[in-house]
């Protein structure tokens, strides 16, 4: 399967632009990365807004839960028809809770993923890898956009490639580093790096990656 670009909506948090997103859709973009945060990352992001607008345009939505208070959040996004995939961070939870959450998402017909900080030892969570659909590897500290790519993520990326899992990488991806990453992952999340591209660059990226 070819690597897919997923647009992080985070740069549009305070300036949602439907016409811009419609132009991205016309360019070939189909997937939106939708960040949800709480005190786990000492920040806030989206709280359910704009999902109807994204559905109207035609986007599928991948929800990334960077939260400690997860049950109300996960139940809400499970109810949203254009949310196709949900990942949540492992760091706040026990293994028993992670198992419970995986089961909850799968029972509701969504793809489920586990998300990891680049400082988290991926190998410790290997027992879950046969029960999930994908993993999200953070290549920046979670909690805000526009950060620089941290090559420490390659430690977890090498481990992840030993397993039959879809891999999503999130944070600091730009045109100057995408080539060293794309061969190892299935989904590349881009936010500010995508917005800064000229239209022809976006179209080329979406067609050739």
Swiss-Prot record:
Its EC number is 5.1.3.1. One of its GO terms (molecular function) is D-ribulose-phosphate 3-epimerase activity. It catalyses: D-ribulose 5-phosphate = D-xylulose 5-phosphate. The active site is at residues 35, 170. Disulfide bonds: none annotated. A divalent metal cation binds at residues 33, 35, 64, 170. Gene3D superfamilies: Aldolase class I. The keyword Ion transport does not apply. Pfam families: Ribul_P_3_epim. SUPFAM superfamilies: Ribulose-phoshate binding barrel (SSF51366). Binds 1 divalent metal cation per subunit. The keyword Iron-sulfur does not apply. Substrate binds at residues 8, 64, 170-172, 191-192. Coiled coil: none annotated. Pathway: Carbohydrate degradation. Signal peptide: none annotated. Its cofactor is a divalent metal cation. GO terms for cellular component: cytosol. Belongs to the ribulose-phosphate 3-epimerase family. Catalyzes the reversible epimerization of D-ribulose 5-phosphate to D-xylulose 5-phosphate. PANTHER family: RIBULOSE-5-PHOSPHATE-3-EPIMERASE. This is Ribulose-phosphate 3-epimerase. It comes from Mycoplasma genitalium (strain ATCC 33530 / DSM 19775 / NCTC 10195 / G37) (Mycoplasmoides genitalium).
């Amino acid at each position: 399967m070819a690597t897919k670009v997923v647009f992080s909506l985070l740069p549009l948090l305070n300036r949602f632009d439907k016409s811009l997103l419609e132009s991205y859709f016309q360019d070939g973009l189909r997937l939106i990365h939708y960040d949800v945060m709480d005190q786990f990352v000492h920040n806030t992001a989206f709280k359910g807004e704009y999902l109807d607008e994204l559905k109207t345009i035609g986007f599928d939505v991948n929800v990334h839960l960077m939260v400690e208070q997860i049950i109300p959040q996960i139940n809400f996004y499970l109810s949203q028809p254009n949310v196709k995939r949900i990942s949540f961070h492992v760091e706040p939870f026990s293994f028993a809770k992670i198992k419970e959450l995986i089961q909850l998402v799968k029972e509701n017909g969504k793809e489920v993923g586990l998300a990891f900080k680049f400082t988290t030892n991926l190998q410790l969570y290997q027992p879950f890898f046969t029960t999930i659909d994908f993993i999200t590897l953070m290549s920046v500290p979670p909690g805000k956009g526009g950060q620089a790519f941290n090559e420490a993520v390659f430690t977890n990326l090498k481990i992840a490639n030993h397993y039959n899992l879809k891999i999503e990488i999130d944070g600091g991806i730009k045109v100057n580093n995408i080539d060293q990453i794309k061969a190892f992952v299935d989904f590349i999340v881009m936010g500010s790096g995508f917005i800064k591209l000229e239209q022809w660059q976006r179209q080329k990226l979406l067609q050739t990656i």
